[in-house]
Amino acid sequence: MDMATKIAKKVSEKGGRTFFVGGYVRDELLKIETKDIDIEVHGIDVDCLVDILESLGNVQKIGASFGVFNLKGYDIDIAMPRKEISNGRGHRDFEIYVDPFIGYEQAAIRRDFTINSMMKDVLTGEIIDPFCGIEDLKNKKLKHINDISFCEDPLRVFRAAQFASRFKFEIDKGTIKLCSSMDVSSLAFERVFEELKKALLKSTEPSIFFTSLKEMKQLSFWFKEVEDLIGIEQSKIHHPEGDVFTHSMMVLDEAAKLKDEAENKSSFMLAALCHDFGKISTTKLRKGKLTAYGHEVESVNLAHEFLNRLTNKISLKKEVLNLVKLHMKPNQMYNTSKKKSMMKLWDDAIHPNDLILLAKADSLGRGIDKDYSEIEMALRASLKDYEELMKEPEVSGKDLIELGLKPGVQFSEYIKLGHKLHLSGLSKEDILKHISNNIKKNQDI
């Protein structure tokens, strides 16, 4: 017997009812597998619920003051019906009142969307659907429940865009209008970033997240750089799809098809979003042609500002900026550059595989029906050469000591020189000869 059923049976013995709620019911009806289980207990007081939970395991009071508990070792959140009344502008500025006898409709009214308001009795399977969530699921419609409660949490603007993106649902016009009126500036950046990540990693068309926010006029505060891409024209020869915003959204959707092949899905998808930010300031009409020379350099600067606004994860930012900086090179170099240059490219990339995938998404996201297989084959062959080269022995500190060099500042310089020569294809023996001659020359000076 699973834990939810055990809890529900004991609650029933005390005269209460236990329901699966929120995303669990929604995903079950959509036939989407979910690990997160949320249940809500009605008809018994908090002390009675705590007694029941303590009889079943180690109770973790993750929000005891507002009736939310957890049992150690189980992925299940146990909550009680509650009212949330805003007392400020922030995501957490609420007064919370637990009321286990509030009734099903009043308990559901505090939820954001109709598709998240359904309740399923754990024991009987009965679904209580006071706001027609099942109908909206069938019609692929995302609709808020209550104007007042919805506006109490500005994060719901981004949740609306995220759900629309993940499920390819149409957002109700009334919900769009309401979202357009909400102030999102006080939200904690971590919360906004979490919704962005869900859209990027759980959606097959993450562009819908941004086109939805565009329709709501809610790009400007958190996604200023994305908004600034709108209307930036491109060469119709190379980019028949339209402006830089359109291109970036197409690249993002192409990247979504490839993300499962990426070494780091998060940095890969963020790089796909940020890769052309630099075109905002570098796009110019030169001799009758639209160009954006050096946009990849400026893209790094703007992507850095963008990421700093949304996350403090240093390694993630480093990986994104590395991909953005190098994103042009694979398609520029694959059939024109010397092997040495290609080896340096792969060496400069933190995740060479992801760089190839980004170049592929960038190429395919141009509205041109183009087969990328030949280019990808050439790039992967070159990357394989690099990987084989990296298996060969390189110059170490021990080698330098054997050449008579004492540990110091020069050590790292000679290690770097050895690696550079290794990339050019020299054997370790030849590299050591080169370094030995270099050391002797410096000693003779």
Each language-model region and where it sits:
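Catalytic cores of the polymerase beta-like nucleotidyltransferase superfamily
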Residues: 1-445
